[in-house]
Amino acid sequence: MNLSDAINAVNRVKDIINSHNTWRRKETINLIPSENVMSPLAEYFYINDMMGRYAEGTIGNRYYQGVKYVDEIEAYLVDLMSKLFHASYVDVRPISGTVANMAVYLTLAKGGKIAAVPRQCGGHISHDEVGAPGAFGIKVIHLPCDEENFSINVDSAVKVIREEKPQLVILGASLYLFPHPVKELAQVAHENGAYLMHDSAHVLGLIAGGQFPNSLNEGADLMTSSTHKTFPGPQGGVIFTNNESIFKNIQRAVFPQLTSNYHLHRYASTAITAIEMMTFGESYAYQVRLNAKKLAEELSKYGIPVVAEARGFTETHQVVFDASKFGGGAKVAQLLEDGGIIVNKNMLPWDRSAVRPSGIRMGVQEMTRVGMGTQEMAEIAAFMKAILIDGKEPSSVKGEVKEFKAHYTEVKYGFKLSDVGIKCDCLPLNY
C-alpha cells in the first residue's frame, strides 16, 4: 500500500470511529442493560503500556520478567474488589464474564451437570448448552421458571436439584428484574453435594451500592461477573469466593487452561471504577433503581405492556416489556433505534424462538450515569410512546431525542481528570 492509500485507509478508520462516538455518545438514548460508560479518569488510565505486555501466572509467581508494576496494580485491584464485595478471594484475570464462568465450569462441573435458568426465562447464553457448558461436555438441567413473576419456581427447582443432583447450580440472569432465591437454593444444593454460583454480571454495581443482595452473604459458594454493566468499568471478568480450596483450583483454570494474557491494561481503569463505586456507588445504585421504576411506570401508564406489574415491575436497572402488539421485539428495537433510542430484543418466558422474540429489554444504568433522573425517565417514556402508541415516524422523533440528549454529555458519579490534578484534552470521547 502506498502512502496516499494508507492515509486514506487510516482516515476511513478515523471516520468510522468518530461517527460511532458521536452517534452513541451524543445523539442517542442508550438503554442496553449490558453496557455503560467509564468516567473520564477511568478512560484516561485505560490507555497504558500494559496493553502490550504479558504476565502469565499469579501475583509474585509469573512466567515473564518486567512485571513488578503489573503485580502491584493487580494486587491493589484485588484488594479493592475484596473490600468492596466482602470476598476473601478474588481473581481479576478473566477477560470477560463468560471466561469467569468457564473457569468455574472447568473447576467444578467439567463433564458433569449444571442446573441453570433457561434462556427464555432470562438465563445467559454462557449458562446454556449452546454456549460454554456444551463446549465442556456439560449437561444443562433447567431450573423451572415462575413465568408470571419473572423468577424461579423455588419448590420445583428444589425438586430438580434433588432428583438430578448437578455438580453446580447457577443463579443470576441476563434478563434480571428481581433477586433470585440464593439462600433457599444454596441450602438445597449443599445438601445434595452441589456448589452454587451466582452470575452477578448485570447487578454487580447494584451490589456495590447496597441496592441488591450480595450472594456470598446468602450462601453462594462463588460469584462471577463482568465489570462493565452496572459496575461501570472496562470490559473484563472477575470471580469472588470465600472458599480457599475452590479458589486455588479456579486460579489454575484461569491460567493455564483458559487464558495466557489477561488484558492487563484494564486493571487500572477497573481499580479507578472500584474506587468510584466506594465513593459514589451508594447514590448511583439508588438512583438507578429509582429511574428503572419510573421508566416502567411511565411506559405502563401509556399502555405499553411492561412485565411484572404485580411485583412493581423491577428491582434492578432493567425494564422489560412485551412488544407483541407492536410487531415483536426485533421490529420494535429497530423502530426505536431509528428514533435514536437504543434497546435490545429479548426472549420472554413464553417465547420459543431466540430469532423472533417478543420482548424488549432495557437498562437505565448508562443514562443514570450521565445525570438523568426520574423526570428524564418520563421524557424517555414519552418519546417511546410517540413512536409505539401514537404511530409517529421515528425520523420525526429522532431530532427531539438528539436535542434532549445534548444536555446529558458529562459522566456523573465518578472522577474528572481535574479532580486529581490531570490537565489533558486528550480523551477522544468527550462524554
Curated annotation (Swiss-Prot):
One Gene Ontology term, aspect cellular component: cytoplasm
Pfam families to which the protein is assigned, alphabetical: SHMT (PF00464)
GO terms, molecular function: glycine hydroxymethyltransferase activity; pyridoxal phosphate binding
Names of the cofactor(s): pyridoxal 5'-phosphate
Keywords, ordered alphabetically: Amino-acid biosynthesis, Cytoplasm, One-carbon metabolism, Pyridoxal phosphate, Transferase
Binding site for (6S)-5,6,7,8-tetrahydrofolate: G123, H124, I125
SUPFAM superfamilies: PLP-dependent transferases
EC id: 2.1.2.-
Enzyme class, broadest EC rank: transferase
Cited InterPro entries: PyrdxlP-dep_Trfase, PyrdxlP-dep_Trfase_major, PyrdxlP-dep_Trfase_small, Ser_HO-MeTrfase, Ser_HO-MeTrfase-like, Ser_HO-MeTrfase_PLP_BS, SHMT-like_dom
Function: Catalyzes the reversible interconversion of serine and glycine with a modified folate serving as the one-carbon carrier. Also exhibits a pteridine-independent aldolase activity toward beta-hydroxyamino acids, producing glycine and aldehydes, via a retro-aldol mechanism.
Homology family: Belongs to the SHMT family.
Record's protein name: Serine hydroxymethyltransferase
